Each structure stands twice: as C-alpha cells, then as structure tokens.
C-alpha cells in the first residue's frame, strides 16, 4: 500500500501536535518546534472556515494512524454502517488495526515502527503470522512478537519506552513474553481528548 514519505516533522508542525510520536523516541531539534507552523519563521496560520477546521481534524487523525485517504474514507463508511456512535466507531476501527495494537502493546516505539514489524512478518496473532497492518484485531486475540524477532534491539528498546507511558486498560501485556491480549475495544473515555471525531463525522456527512 502507498504511504506518505515526505517530511514528517513539517506535518506535525502544521497540525501543532506530534503526529508520528517522534518526541517520545528522541529529542526533537529546537529548530523544529512542533507548535510553530511550517516555514522559516513559522508562517501565520490562516483563519479557517468550518469546512477547513473539519478537514484539518480529519487530516490530523488520518496521519496519526498512518492511513491514506481512500482507506480512511472506507473506515468512515464502515463506522457509519455499524450500530452506535459513528465517530466512536471510527476511532475503535482505527485502534483495532494490527499496527496500532502492536504500538499500544509497546512492541514498536512508534506506529510506523510497529507497521514495519508487521510487514516484516515479526508479529503473530493467535499463533499465526500476520503481515497486514490494517488487519482488524478482535477481542481476546493474542498478539505476540515472533520468536526470532524477540532478540531485536528495537523491540526491547520500544518495551522500555512503553514503561514510561500509561498502560491501555483494554490491553493485557506480558512484556517478558512479548505477548499481549486485546481484551476489548477501547471506549471513547480511554482515548485522547485531543481528537474531535465529531468534526470528521460532520465533514463526511455533507
């Protein structure tokens, strides 16, 4: 699948947040201030219309999870088809992606690194190797690092980094075994308040 290969810090500065989790892995150069807009001196951000605000929120969430436009729209369509709140359904689908679950369990330092582990066949789901990043993990699925990948220094480093983060309540992780259980889908209260999914629903509902 195609993926964005351009300057990631520039996108983070545009959205005003660490989209790609770089600051948790290494110190970001002081010249690359996330809160400052792209440009030599941080171009002044234009005043956005309602549509512009909705579009910017969609772009932010899409980039956080590393999903391209067509796939993101398909996630929205599936979320709208399911029972319940469309915005919350959308976030649950994104959180259920295998690459995201691998990141949440602490096996990858960033979602991009977790996606690479999946594509390199380093991740096992219920005893079977799965190399599709968008694979939807279901409640009670067991996700683990493949035996021959457990010695990788990046996996060990990621687990150490994960110890500094708040542990997701919807997951159960045995760091020593490099194995975890997806106990349930996360509830809205479990996830970041920095995301306004209602704006995305408004955008796609037009």
UniProtKB/Swiss-Prot annotation:
Q: Which InterPro entries match?
A: Ribosomal_uS4 (IPR022801), Ribosomal_uS4_bac-type (IPR005709), Ribosomal_uS4_CS (IPR018079), Ribosomal_uS4_N (IPR001912), S4_RNA-bd (IPR002942), S4_RNA-bd_sf (IPR036986)
Q: Start and end of every S4 RNA-binding domain?
A: 96-156
Which Pfam families does the record associate with it? Ribosomal_S4, S4
Give all cystine bridges in this chain.
none
- GO biological process terms, semicolon-separated: ribosomal small subunit biogenesis; translation
Q: Which UniProt keywords apply?
A: Ribonucleoprotein, Ribosomal protein, RNA-binding, rRNA-binding
- Gene Ontology MF term list: rRNA binding; structural constituent of ribosome
* Gene Ontology CC: one annotated term: small ribosomal subunit
- Coiled coil region boundaries: none
- Recorded family membership: Belongs to the universal ribosomal protein uS4 family.
Assembly, per entry? Part of the 30S ribosomal subunit. Contacts protein S5. The interaction surface between S4 and S5 is involved in control of translational fidelity.
NCBIfam families under this entry?
PRK05327.1 (NF003717), rpsD_bact (TIGR01017)
Protein function:
One of the primary rRNA binding proteins, it binds directly to 16S rRNA where it nucleates assembly of the body of the 30S subunit.
Q: What is this protein called?
A: Small ribosomal subunit protein uS4
Annotated source species: Edwardsiella ictaluri (strain 93-146)
């Amino acid at each position: 699948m195609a993926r964005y290969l351009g300057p990631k810090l520039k996108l983070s500065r545009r959205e005003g947040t660490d989209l790609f989790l770089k600051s948790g892995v290494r110190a970001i150069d002081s010249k690359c201030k996330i809160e400052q807009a792209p440009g030599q001196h941080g171009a002044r951000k234009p005043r956005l219309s309602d549509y512009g605000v909705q579009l910017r929120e969609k772009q932010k969430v899409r980039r956080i999870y590393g999903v391209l436009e067509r796939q993101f729209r398909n996630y929205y369509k599936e979320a709208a088809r399911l029972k319940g709140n469309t915005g919350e359904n959308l976030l649950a689908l994104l959180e259920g992606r295998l690459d995201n679950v691998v990141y949440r369990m602490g096996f990858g330092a960033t979602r991009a690194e977790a996606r690479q582990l999946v594509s390199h066949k380093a991740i096992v789901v219920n005893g079977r190797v799965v190399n599709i990043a968008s694979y939807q993990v279901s409640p009670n699925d067991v996700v683990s690092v493949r035996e021959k990948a457990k010695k990788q220094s990046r996996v060990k480093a990621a687990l150490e980094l994960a110890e500094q983060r708040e542990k997701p309540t919807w997951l159960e992780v045995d760091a020593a075994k490099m194995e975890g259980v997806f106990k349930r889908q996360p509830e809205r209260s479990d996830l970041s308040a920095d995301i306004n999914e209602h704006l995305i629903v408004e955008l796609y509902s037009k």
